[in-house]
Amino acid sequence: MKNKRVIFLNGPMGAGKTTVGRLIQRSLAGCAFIDGDWCMDLEPFVGNSETRAMAADNILHMLAGYNNCSHCRGVVVAWLMDRPEICRALEEGAAKIGLETAWFTLLCTEEALGARWRGDKLCPWRTEENLKVSVRSLEAFSRLPGVPVDTSGMTAEQVRDHILKHLSD
């Protein structure tokens, strides 16, 4: 029997991980979706090694549950995984529970990121200060594991199609 697959979507804030992840989920029968932000939703927000490790553990717990569910065929995880040790922990944890993995890092130009950022009126943390943080992180994300996907000039649907084509090759 073929193992279930988890598709990890990584990238800076505003790259389109959640939007693309939801589109992938809707395109694959029996696909679950995990937004890593749900797994460390603290108020006020605290992003440090302790909370990142907790979120990774929460993601792995959810992956194990979906892996044991007969109705689930695969999972998409969208999260900002900016530390190699977090990527490693998720990769190793997924392997331990018998999941195949596919990693994609969504990247874009600074201009595309800014345009998307300013167009998202619903997200309360789309501030100019956070945009600067996201722009500064672009280069670091290009060095992390995963198939790089330059989403500049692409719609979310085109990014989804690109990823699904890559998975079918």
Mark where each language-model region is.
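Conserved lysine of the Walker
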Residues: 17
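Pre-Walker A (Motif I) flank of P-loop NTPase domains
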Residues: 2-6, 72-73
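Conserved phosphate-donor/acceptor-positioning beta-strand/loop module used by diverse small-molecule
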Residues: 97-117, 149
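Walker A (P-loop) phosphate-binding loop of P-loop NTPases
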Residues: 14
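Glycine-rich phosphate-binding loop used to anchor ATP phosphates in small-molecule kinases
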Residues: 54-98
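Conserved substrate/cofactor phosphate-moiety recognition/catalytic segment
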Residues: 21-64
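Hydrophobic anchor at the beta1->P-loop junction of P-loop NTPases
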Residues: 9
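Small-molecule kinase domains that catalyze NTP-dependent phosphoryl transfer to phosphate-bearing small molecules
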Residues: 119-162
